[in-house]
Swiss-Prot record:
Signal peptide coordinates: 1-19
GO biological process: defense response to Gram-positive bacterium; killing of cells of another organism; peptidoglycan catabolic process
Catalytic activity of the protein: Hydrolysis of (1->4)-beta-linkages between N-acetylmuramic acid and N-acetyl-D-glucosamine residues in a peptidoglycan and between N-acetyl-D-glucosamine residues in chitodextrins
GO molecular function: lysozyme activity
Name of the molecule in the record: Lysozyme B
Role, per record: Has antibacterial activity.
Post-translational modification comment from the UniProt entry: Contains six disulfide bonds.
Entry's localization field: Cytoplasmic vesicle lumen
Propeptide residue interval(s): 139-181
Transmembrane segments: none
Record's keyword terms, sorted: Antibiotic, Antimicrobial, Bacteriolytic enzyme, Cytoplasmic vesicle, Disulfide bond, Glycosidase, Hydrolase, Signal
UniProt KW Signal keyword: yes
EC number, as in UniProt: 3.2.1.17
Gene (UniProt): alyB
Amino acid sequence: MRISFFLLILAVIIGYAYGYSCPKPCYGNMCCSTSPGNKYYLTDFCGSTSACGPVPSCSGALYFTADSQRFGCGKHLNLCRGSKCVKAQIYDAGPAMWVEQDAGMMIIDASPTICHVLTGGSSCGWSDKFEITATVTSLTDSRPLGPFNVTEEEKAQLFIDHEIAMAQCEAEKTCNGFDLE
């Protein structure tokens, strides 16, 4: 009886730990949903194809991300870890939903430069569990692509701007996989 109870408790704990499921799958193998609280794990990539046009070079200090299925091609994201942030442009789709399921959390795939700026490391994998926030920039944001620092008040404003930008792209059906409906 005790062993059965122990196994049941263990199964419940494992289910919660690895229970991530995408609320809105799209394109066969990706997730179009955005993360509650805008929290994601950071991974890095450097691809040979792009869902949004030209493939960015992987050499040099470039600030790009995937996740076009969530936010839209060409949009800008503010990626923050603590008070360190990077403004980046969306160039590609991804990651695959199975990667997020293995990680147990939604992921922002970003350039190796972004990984280095936000973590100090040379690579970011989902198992590193580098948690960041990702917010869509406002249409009036004139900040150039690249790193910047924020205060708590400025970070709060990034979240407000994100909600406004997401409401606009949802109304225009240019994000969250609306083109699939």
